[in-house]
Amino acid sequence: MSEQSSKYIAALLAVLSISMVLGIDLFIFSLQSEKQTMPHLGVGVLVAQLISLLVFYRGEICPGQRGRLIKVNMTFAIYWAVWLLISLLQNNHTLTNVMSVCGLSVVYFIWKQPKTEKIRNSFLLMAALIAGLGCLSYLMIFTELPASDFAEYNPFAPILSGVILANLVLVIARNRLQGFIALLPLAMIILLALNALAMFLFLLLNGMESAVNSESVFAYIIYFVCHFVIAAILILHSFQKWTLSTNSLFILLFIAVCLPLWMVFV
């Protein structure tokens, strides 16, 4: 495969991955009876950007790897631009605006990072602070939601999606930090367990009354089956000492970003 063809395929995969996240997020938004202009998966995209910033800041990567990772990260602008537009068309959604602007700002800082290491590191630290502000905006919106909405907006699920997305981004960009990439599946397993535990406690303490009809029971069954599927894929790759391929990561990402979708039906 020629270098030019490889670049086109990488660009296509990058656009496809963020488009899948955006498409499912917008589908969830369209299903809501009471429109809450808050991206369910926004904090996950911010987490993916933060992991990319960590690679830029601490990773010993060559200019070629840096350039490829910058190009892949630029596709995140699609997600944030769409959500900023949606938020601006609604009323009284300032925190979502802030979150979207923070996401776009991180894309800009990554794109324009200087070549001089000292200045570049300052640039990247500023971008990390902005991403942190975006996560804080998400947290502020989350704390204003009623307790009954926890299942749908549970932050562990989108954070899990963000780690998977970051892994996919690094693979698409052909990053060679194999030691760091090998740690990401472990983070996925931990987040998957935390998400399952949080949902189990929610059901135990607050949500049993929501699981009385067949539609809710079916949604919860699919939700937890998805956990087993993700865990099975990760454990199989771990036992066989396989690295997560692009195809495997796309499957994992699709399952993970659909987790909040099932909770809309509860």
UniProtKB/Swiss-Prot annotation:
Cellular compartments per GO CC: plasma membrane
Membrane among keywords: yes
Segments traversing the membrane: 9-29, 37-57, 69-89, 123-143, 153-173, 184-204, 216-236, 246-266
This protein's UniProt keywords: Cell membrane, Membrane, Transmembrane, Transmembrane helix
Taxonomic path: Bacteria, Pseudomonadati, Pseudomonadota, Gammaproteobacteria, Pasteurellales
Full protein name: Uncharacterized protein HI_1241
Coiled coil location: none
Record flagged with keyword Transmembrane helix: yes
Protein topology in the membrane: Multi-pass membrane protein
Annotated compartments: Cell membrane
